[in-house]
Amino acid sequence: MTAMQPGTRVGRVERTTRESSVLVELDLDGTGQVDIDTTVPFYDHMLTALGTHAAFDLKVKSSGDVHIDAHHTVEDTAIVFGQALRQALGGKLGIRRFGDAWIPMDETLAHAAVDVSGRSYCVMTGEPEQYNSFTIGGNYPFVLNRHVFESIAFHSQINLHVRVIHGRDPHHIAEAQYKAIARALRAAVEPDPRFSGVVPSTKGAL
């Protein structure tokens, strides 16, 4: 991935704690170029899918105390991703604001809906409870999906709803969720020529 050039819808956030070190750069008007290394291979796979299908240029570099478990690194990366997304959105002028997507993956079907509203909220439904203790790819507990999506929604100040309609394979469920969010975000942040230079809200602010 080439170095990002300054743009009007670019976010860059670094965050370091005693548990992790995270850098996220993203360009909302990219072409899906991704450069991901979180030291958690399945999470790399999911963030690659997210950046690709959102058509964001996305760079993520994370390291942390994965010798304990992946929780801190995964959640902290989601926090910084949300902050970078919020930064890239700026004043939210001229965006479509709302987006949703249905994503099938073999036996799985997932749906995501996004409102770039400035109001942080996340609702997740339909995930099979028996998978909450299931680990994918060696060190990615399935239950971390909830932490990731809630952290993204809270720190980007978006309203995010994610539904699993049906599915049996935890990998397929997680991947369909990430791709549905990606496509919903892509639609929501897309410029709307009819709202050019205008905040898409009756309040005049988001």
From Swiss-Prot:
Matching entries from Pfam families are given as: IGPD
User: What's a BP term from Gene Ontology annotated to this protein?
Assistant: L-histidine biosynthetic process
Q: Give GO cellular component annotations, separated by semicolons.
A: cytoplasm
UniProt xrefs under CDD domains: IGPD (cd07914)
Q: What class of enzyme is it?
A: lyase
Q: What is its main location?
A: cytoplasm
Keyword field contains Amino-acid biosynthesis:
yes
Per the record, what are the reactions this protein catalyses? D-erythro-1-(imidazol-4-yl)glycerol 3-phosphate = 3-(imidazol-4-yl)-2-oxopropyl phosphate + H2O
Q: Cross-referenced NCBIfam families, in alphabetical order?
A: PRK00951.1-6, PRK00951.2-1, PRK00951.2-4
PANTHER family, per the entry: IMIDAZOLEGLYCEROL-PHOSPHATE DEHYDRATASE (PTHR23133:SF2), IMIDAZOLEGLYCEROL-PHOSPHATE DEHYDRATASE HIS7 (PTHR23133)
- Indicate what this protein is called per its UniProt record: Imidazoleglycerol-phosphate dehydratase
Question: Which species does this protein come from?
Answer: Saccharopolyspora erythraea (strain ATCC 11635 / DSM 40517 / JCM 4748 / NBRC 13426 / NCIMB 8594 / NRRL 2338)
Query: Per UniProt, what is the name of the gene that codes for the protein in this document?
Result: hisB
